[in-house]
Amino acid sequence: MNKKSIRDVDLKGKRVFCRVDFNVPMKEGKITDETRIRAALPTIQYLVEQGAKVILASHLGRPKGQAVEELRLTPVAARLGELLGKDVKKADEAFGPVAQEMVAAMNEGDVLVLENVRFYAGEEKNDAELAKEFAALADIFVNDAFGAAHRAHASTAGIADYLPAVSGLLMEKELEVLGKALSNPERPFTAIIGGAKVKDKIGVIRHLLDKVDNLIIGGGLAYTFVKALGHEIGLSLCEDDKIELAKEFMQLAKEKGVNFYMPVDVVITEEFSETATTKIVGIDSIPSNWEGVDIGPKTREIYADVIKNSKLVVWNGPMGVFEMTPFSQGTKAVGQALADAEGTYSVIGGGDSAAAVEKFGMADKMSHISTGGGASLEFMEGKELPGVVCLNDK
């Protein structure tokens, strides 16, 4: 990682505008999952210990450029105070006189949470005037919001035009882990790509075919590949306009010497419910009025074996509709194989895969769980992330 981090700069007495990702799920004013707040703690604690004046900025939900009462960061600031064991102040604005006054009153080691940056229309437009307003509050910009690093917004990228810009500890770790996976992976290197749609994963599959030894396919997107092999897939998800692309990917894998794994058997159902009747069939035997919803037991065994014999595994996207118990076994089996694998470094690419390992109680067995769904996806596509490009080089 050739970007400067908070370890590379003097922070004592400095006003630090630290962009974090506190976009946590809320229900009736209560935080239902505080993973993202906890993920930011090491950076915040480091800034506090170094004697910085810590000004935290984040978005929450999609207020679309106006103040929305239930999307204020007040409950987040309160919970952060409990987790840090110290008084955390909350501003009702993200810039301007009120915020400036509160910043002016800060002592070294104090923590202030600004209001939801997406209450302002200029945030998502990366408006230069708004970025200047944010910058006016501080001496240094720290980006620790990997989950929003693929967005060129005023508080994630624009502000870096006006202040020295460095990464926080979470951002640094994400870039280190994902960067090493793509540039200098331990081998055998396996990528597991699941999820519903081929179109969401085209860039990732294309980019990874040049990097991996094994590519494992699962989830709804697998049925487009099954159909590309000439099999009937009943009512399973299929993107007919991507069948040629699926054929191309399978051919590319062959040419590049990549082992390409797709389901050999699947779990099928006639209805989507917790009590659904399911059957297990080979991929060439899906009846016309049934739908594939998970990978079958033979496939799970094959995939687990590949995982066990890999040194590095990157997993992005579930193997089936894991939210429903009858269709969750494939995703669970992949998670279990990663949890049990010895000497395998496992990288979970945020989003649904992270939610799945969390749900099955396997999170602590994974080597690295990315905090950015969209950001880790774009990073794995080989794209430059605006929230990273804007940081100062070492």
Curated annotation (Swiss-Prot):
GO terms for molecular function: ADP binding; ATP binding; phosphoglycerate kinase activity. It is an enzyme of class 2 (transferase). Keywords: ATP-binding, Cytoplasm, Glycolysis, Kinase, Nucleotide-binding, Phosphoprotein, Transferase. Pfam families: PGK. PROSITE patterns: PGLYCERATE_KINASE (PS00111). It comes from the Bacteria. Monomer. GO terms for cellular component: cytosol. It is found in: Cytoplasm. The keyword 4Fe-4S does not apply. Pathway: Carbohydrate degradation; glycolysis; pyruvate from D-glyceraldehyde 3-phosphate: step 2/5. The modification Phosphoserine is found at S183. Substrate binds at D21, F22, N23, R36, H59, L60, G61, R62, R118, R151. Its EC number is 2.7.2.3. GO terms for biological process: gluconeogenesis; glycolytic process. It comes from Bacillus thuringiensis subsp. konkukian (strain 97-27). ATP binds at K201, G292, E323, G350, G351, D352, S353. This is Phosphoglycerate kinase. Its main location: cytoplasm. The keyword Protein biosynthesis does not apply. Belongs to the phosphoglycerate kinase family. InterPro entries: Phosphoglycerate_kinase (IPR001576), Phosphoglycerate_kinase_CS (IPR015911), Phosphoglycerate_kinase_N (IPR015824), Phosphoglycerate_kinase_sf (IPR036043). The modification Phosphothreonine is found at T299.
